[in-house]
Amino acid sequence: MSLKPVKLAFEKYSATVAKHPPVLIFHGLLGSKRNWRSLAKKFSCKLDRDIYAIDQRCHGDSPCVAPLSYSAMALDAFQFMKDHKLDKASIIGHSMGAKTAMVTALKWPDKVEKLVVVDNSPWYQDLPRDYGAYFRKMIQIDEANITKYSEADKMMSTVEKDILVRSFLLSNLKKDSNNSNTFKFRVPIELISKSLKTIEGFPASLNDLVYDSPTLVIRALKAPFIPDSALPVFKKFFPKYELVSLDCGHWVHFEKPKEFSESIINFLNN
């Protein structure tokens, strides 16, 4: 099956004077461009670069089109640069977006000035068991025709006690276009849940490729996504990588926003 790119929704944060190539930001699984608003504004000021916070396919306001694979999402990223006449950009990717960013850099290295990989590795990586429970519960919520956000929150609280994580997951709820009294998820829950094995993986076709430009890897020490055993794999694909480890969980940009943003600003300004 030949892949076709989709037009990605985005929010642009313009620098007062853009002195350097722009930055593309790719969110994680079930995230969206909205999760990055405050950091994107900060980056545009501190980096003198235009910042594009982007919704990946099947997320946010971008089209819901199969397949949800890294080859497809990287092609979307490449097409986005083409459509917006961006000769070169730096890319920041978190979680699923980190793999999209890595695949894009490996396939089109001349298009990527610098790469920032946030808490994911270039290999097969099991998602925590919580994700299966999240998706099963989200399907139940979608089918329940709920009329209040609080009802969805109550249902989700049976599988996730942390209110911040629940609020992140439920940020995908919106009023149903066919019935404004009920809420539905804006993302295709069934398609994404069927694509989890692909999302856990990394394309084997890239095994002989190298991205030989500066790469920053930000690791969350309280998450399982970048174990020490992954570091030689980073060295193979990204020989110029440097590692920053932060004492937090997987949602690094929420838990350690100051340290996270300073690491990226220093790296991109260097």
UniProtKB/Swiss-Prot annotation:
GO BP, sorted A to Z: fatty acid metabolic process; lipid metabolic process
Principal location listed in the UniProt entry: mitochondrion
GO cellular component, one term: mitochondrion
Location of the protein in the cell: Mitochondrion
Active site residues according to the UniProt entry: 95 (charge relay system), 190 (charge relay system), 250 (charge relay system)
EC numbers, comma separated: 3.1.-.-
Organism of origin: Schizosaccharomyces pombe (strain 972 / ATCC 24843)
Keywords: Hydrolase, Mitochondrion
PANTHER family with a match to the protein in the record: PROTEIN ABHD11 (PTHR46118:SF4)
SUPFAM superfamilies according to UniProt: alpha/beta-Hydrolases (SSF53474)
Domain of life the protein comes from: Eukaryota
Enzymatic class: hydrolase
InterPro entries cross-referenced by the UniProt entry: AB_hydrolase_1, AB_hydrolase_fold
GO molecular function annotations of the record: carboxylic ester hydrolase activity; palmitoyl-(protein) hydrolase activity
Protein name: Abhydrolase domain-containing protein C22H12.03
AB hydrolase-1 domain segment(s): 21-257
